Amino acid sequence: KKGAARSGPVHTVRPEGAAQLAIVGPPNSGKSSLHRYLTGSRAEIGPHGHTTQKPMPGMLAFEDIQFQLIDLPPIAADYMEGWFVNALQPAQGALLVVDISDPGCTDHVAMICGRLEEKKIALIERWPGLDPDDQIPIDTDSEILDPFRIYLPTLLVANKIDLDQGAEDANLLREFLGTRFPLLAASSKNGVGLNEIGPLLFRGLEIVRVYTKTPGKIPEMDRPFTVKRGSTVLDVARLVHKDIAGSLRYARAWGKDVFDGQQVGPEHSLADGDVVELHMR
């Protein structure tokens, strides 16, 4: 006998684009306005907190790729949706949005980090591709090896700087907020600072764009495959089609680290902007 069909909303969004990022924050931080500005979504915006009731996906365009941004319901000191952990499972990072004009914004940062820690979700300062000198190292003995914890590299977005004209200095902001998260002063009202998010995500997540071509034809330069730094020709072949990956013999590559049309093996590491022509057995 089959079980009953599951009913109710699905709180996990299937990842699309180069990476999925979760947008989290306290009520009235302007995170839904930020999501709408960045993605053109129809995220509901209201004067009162808790306007967002379910995950709202949207796509942030950066050059020839896109990042998927998921606007999640706000986190309050006395309430957080029970399905929040499930919603964060596919995410590769987070944008923590606070209202810099709110005197309690420092407490909000600590509160949200604490509430998520209770659910074994760690908002961490370190991004793989950002300067390690500007980031706090992770205690690898006590944290990084914990298989039951979700680690999300986090960008702190100090929103509503249009309401606090002294908030443009990121160093002063970081000192004021008492955090080592990478920090961006921004405004979802006039867009100040928001054009920096795409480049930061691209660098921080070590995204590599790889273009493919068919023998005898020009490369397909409008829709790159996206992988992480250190990925190989075989990794890209798996994205193209599992049968191609299974019968891959070699590839010809064009890029800054190879001669034009150089023959490379399946384990050849790829760089951003490389073009590959896959050859099968």
PLM segments and residue spans:
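A short, terminal or domain-edge coil/loop segment
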Residues: M59-D64, I100, G104-H108, C113, ...
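Conserved G1/Walker A P-loop phosphate-binding module
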Residues: K1-T106, G114
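Short, glycine/charged-enriched secondary-structure capping and boundary segments
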Residues: Y37-L38, G82-V85, V109-I112, D169-L173, ...
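Generic structural hydrophobic/aromatic packing signal, biased to beta-strands
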Residues: L60, L69, I112, V210-T212, ...
